[in-house]
Amino acid sequence: MSETDTVADRAGSRSATGGRRATPGGPRPAGERRPYWTARRRDQLTGYLFITPQMLGSAVFVILPLILVVWYSLHEWNVLAGTFDYVGAENYQALADDTNLPGVLKATGLFSIGLVIFNLALALLLAVLLNQRLRGSIVFRTLFFSPVVVSLVAWTIVWGFLLQDNGGINGLLDTIGVDGPNWLRGETTAMLSVIVVQVFKNVGLNMVLFLAALQGVPAELYEAAEVDGASRMRQFWRITVPLISPTILLTSIITVVGSLQVFAQIAVLTQGGPGTSTTVLVYYLYQQAFQFHHFGYGATLSIALFAIVLALTVLQWQMRKRWVFHES
């Protein structure tokens, strides 16, 4: 190819692009269309494809059931009679007029408060002790965490045998001359027993979370505090608690939500008794829907439970601005 032909080709390419030379990475010449499948669009499509299974699962198992629950709450559904009648807001009016609801909410509140306090306090105490790197700490960590992976129903049944009037706990008390109470038949002891069973079931999870947070606290801060003459207790409240406050927030939200969803322990140990002293909201919902066959009212109670959980979660999340410490 001659030099004359090369110059002519270059001139033709300039005229085709309006007299401007296209440079790699530079602005696109006027009149040239941007390709649709750019690298950015391909990355976006890849991301959407990856989250599609999760979105489908959420739609089928979360969003659709919520819509159906709202729909059922507007109807009176009697499975035995085969009727499904629209009643509008009557179930919500029945919720407002339910004389049993205050006692149910009281029992739910007592259980939630007791569980959150004992669970978080014991989990933090165990985490602090295990963080001392004492001999055998790995064994104790495994022992405390093992109930988390045990079947909930099996765990509760075993505790039911231990808490009987002639069970293992009262047998131990008899050996030291103490007459143990009937744990599951007294109003106060029944609620306390259910709380203790749930605390020992899940304390290991919060303990592991606290332990991970404690191991992330820089040792230099404690060394500097010791040089300044700060006591161990002052170091704990001024250094440890602020730096693990995000984990405290996380564990408190998890524990509060879990406390409002308790069912198996009540169903196995007390069946809501004695009386209604341990009838929490989820168990009351179960009674209305599956024992008394008031499915519409049961759906209304589930909406009330959802509203309570959502309100408490939002409240905890908003309160984080006052006491949760972020290094950034």
Where are these regions (language model features)?
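A structural signal for multi-pass alpha-helical bundles of membrane permease subunits
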Residues: 43-328
